[in-house]
Regions:
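Short, solvent-exposed mixed-charge patches
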Residues: 95-97
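Periplasmic OmpA-like peptidoglycan-binding domain that tethers envelope proteins to the cell wall
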Residues: 7-10, 15-92
């Protein structure tokens, strides 16, 4: 939050993820709640709501195998991306590659 306070032109996207345990609907809502929790923490530290976008992806985009407990733990995460300028950060689903 301190970096964002010192760089008021920067935009942020907070993206939440889950492991593969549970239903798709449950995981989607959980990933959204994770992202929203980080957003609320940033807002409570004085970051303007217009600067912080959120997105939940459920079990999509795992970074590790969901076949192990350590892999599932790694997949339960939130990623915060800060823009290099005043333009909004594109959500993961719109980035090609």
């Amino acid at each position: 939050a301190e970096f964002l306070q010192q760089n008021p032109e920067r935009q942020v996207i907070v993206e939440g993820y889950t492991d593969s345990t549970g239903s798709a609907n449950y995981n989607q809502r959980l990933s959204e709640r994770r992202a929203d929790s980080v957003r609320m923490a940033l807002l409570s530290r004085g970051i303007s709501p217009e600067r912080v976008a959120t997105r939940g992806y459920g079990k999509e985009y795992p970074v590790a195998s969901n076949g192990t407990s350590s892999g599932r733990a790694m997949n339960r995460r939130v990623e915060v991306t800060i823009s290099n300028d005043a333009k909004p950060v594109a959500p993961r689903s719109s980035v090609s590659g």
